[in-house]
A protein has these predicted regions:
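Helix-turn-helix DNA-binding module
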Residues: 46, 128-139, 143-164
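Sigma70-family region 2
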Residues: 16-17, 40-43, 54-71, 90-92
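Internal acidic/polar
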Residues: 4-5, 86, 94-119, 150, ...
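DNA-recognition helix of helix-turn-helix
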Residues: 74, 81, 85, 137, ...
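Structural recognition of an alpha-helix C-terminal capping motif at a helix-to-coil junction
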Residues: 36, 50-57, 70-82
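Arg/Lys-rich amphipathic alpha helix in sigma70-family domain 2
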Residues: 64-68, 78-99, 111, 119, ...
Length: 194
């Protein structure tokens, strides 16, 4: 058994035994990456923070099921992805509020001379394009291209084959390219008409 696997099993055992210091260690080691994942999947800081708390509450309840077959971080990612996808499905009917606060940002230049609204619109375009991806493709894309996980790890996190992960990342990139290219073309047409 590798040292990191032994450390994962020992940390999980300490958490199960009620060692608050161990759970704090677990939280500090993984909270930032899990928050980042939740934020990128949800596009909303408040929702990501709420979900992060739910993820760690769930982890605390489910640590009994951790057997050490995968790294503790991978197990947490899988738990997080399941909760995130459940949350996304439950709110599928609600529209995201991507434009809050943009009305006042339009005329403020940043240090590079770009308008803040232009950067916000770029971010909104990306968020909208990501939101149009199927859940599996979006999750695989974010885990691979944003979080830096390997396809094998993504397979473990999402419960899919390594080849499926590769396929979903590829499909996500193609669809994002198509959606963002379409958005640029639409903006260009609108600006030509002014």
């Amino acid at each position: 058994m590798s040292t990191s696997k032994e450390a994962d099993l020992a940390l999980a055992a300490r958490c199960r035994d009620g060692d608050l210091g161990a759970f704090e260690e677990l939280y500090k080691a993984h909270a930032a990456r899990l928050y980042s994942l939740a934020f990128r999947m949800l596009g909303n800081a408040a929702d990501a923070e709420d979900l992060l708390q739910e993820i760690f509450l769930s982890a605390h309840r489910k640590l009994e099921s951790f057997r050490g077959e995968a790294a503790l971080g991978t197990w947490l990612y899988r738990l997080a992805m399941n909760q995130i996808l459940d949350y996304v499905r439950s709110r599928a009917g609600r529209a995201g509020q991507l434009t809050d606060g943009l009305e006042d940002a339009g005329t403020l230049p940043d240090a590079g001379g770009h308008r803040l609204a232009d950067r916000a619109i770029d971010r909104i375009d990306l968020e909208r394009a990501l939101a149009e991806l199927p859940d599996g493709c979006r999750a695989a894309f974010l885990l691979h291209d944003v979080e830096g996980l390997e396809h094998k790890e993504i397979g473990q996190v999402l419960g899919i084959a390594e080849g499926t992960s590769k396929s979903q990342v590829h499909k996500a990139r193609l669809k994002l390219r198509r959606l963002l290219t379409r958005n640029v073309a639409e903006l260009s047409e609108r600006s030509d008409g002014l």
